[in-house]
Amino acid sequence: MATIKDVAKLAAVSTTTVSHVINKTRFVAEATQKRVWEAVEELNYAPSAVARSLKCNTTRTIGMLVTQSFNPFFAEVMHGVENYCYKQGYTLFMCNTEGDLEKQKHYLRMLAEKRVDGLLVMCSDLNEQLLTLLEKNTELPMVIMDWGPDSPRTDKIIDNSEEGGYLATKHLIENGHTHIACITGQADKVTCKERVRGFERAHADANLSFNPEWILEGDFECASASKAVDKILSIEESKRPTALFCFNDIMALAAISKIQQSGLRVPEDISVIGYDNIELSAYFSPPLTTIHQPKRRVGKTAVEILLERIKDKDHERRVFEMQPEVVTRSSVLNRLK
């Protein structure tokens, strides 16, 4: 493996000059830079990240704890994170914990050993055990990208779930639906509680009541939505909901599939609105009306906030709030026409 001395010898310069060219720490004549970079390429030289981190007190690496990397919503956020890290010259260590506390402990310890410059935490719900773990690493610049309890010591991304739940339900009501069911995620998750509050507030603003038995608990996965639709379809047709609000697009896809398998039509018989606006939602059959969240922008913003925190650890706490909006496609019938 080539060393910095090999590069210096081939380029006919000192090792100090090679270091300045690679790290861009001092002016070096263009012709000299050209010789150095040609030598680097010819020798396939890779600077020691360990040596550089000891000298500069930075590794130009960021750690990211993720609980559900397979979920399309989180995958799109992660794309925004990775893309912006790359553009800024940072390497991303992505650790998928799947909500396992032992994995979380292991990865936090590993990232600390790697001396990452900062940490992003993206969780489907931030539980107290993970919060306690994170609070033991308060010296590490950190951005929480979660939908759980607040922490005054970290920057945070908020998804504004209550407003999203309100907008989804309001859209259904404005299209003439007064009998609306919803399929939530796990009832104990903060994001679900907030979307239910939005669902209830939209009904109250329209002076409408709702059947609490039509708030059906899912888990953000297809199978739970399919079971929930079975319950809806077991209701006598004349008393059945005309619209269904699913708390993510994956459950909406499963709901549409189940409804169509039963011989009913979407949206003619039952309308469906989703949440997240994942890339696939535009290609559902029918294309899904949903609540948009700026996922890749959220990923980019999280990295921007973290890099500012790395530069200035005493910077005042930042909170970025996503603004949900309705994306109208073809899965909701206007019953007023």
From Swiss-Prot:
Pathway: Purine metabolism; purine nucleotide biosynthesis [regulation]. One of its GO terms (molecular function) is DNA-binding transcription factor activity. The keyword DNA damage does not apply. The keyword Repressor applies. Residues 2-56 form the HTH lacI-type domain. Residues 4-23, 48-56 bind DNA. GO terms for biological process: negative regulation of DNA-templated transcription; purine nucleotide biosynthetic process. SMART domains: HTH_LACI (SM00354). Hypoxanthine binds at residues 73, 189, 191, 220, 276. InterPro entries: HTH_LacI, LacI/GalR-like_sensor, Lambda_DNA-bd_dom_sf, Peripla_BP_I, Tscrpt_reg_HTH_PurR. Keywords: DNA-binding, Purine biosynthesis, Repressor, Transcription, Transcription regulation. Homodimer. Is the main repressor of the genes involved in the de novo synthesis of purine nucleotides, regulating purB, purC, purEK, purF, purHD, purL, purMN and guaBA expression. PurR is allosterically activated to bind its cognate DNA by binding the purine corepressors, hypoxanthine or guanine, thereby effecting transcription repression. Consists of two structural and functional domains: an N-terminal DNA-binding domain, approximately the first 60 residues, and a larger C-terminal domain, approximately 280 residues, which imparts the function of corepressor binding and oligomerization. HAMAP family: HTH_type_PurR. This is HTH-type transcriptional repressor PurR. It comes from Aliivibrio fischeri (strain MJ11) (Vibrio fischeri). The gene is purR.
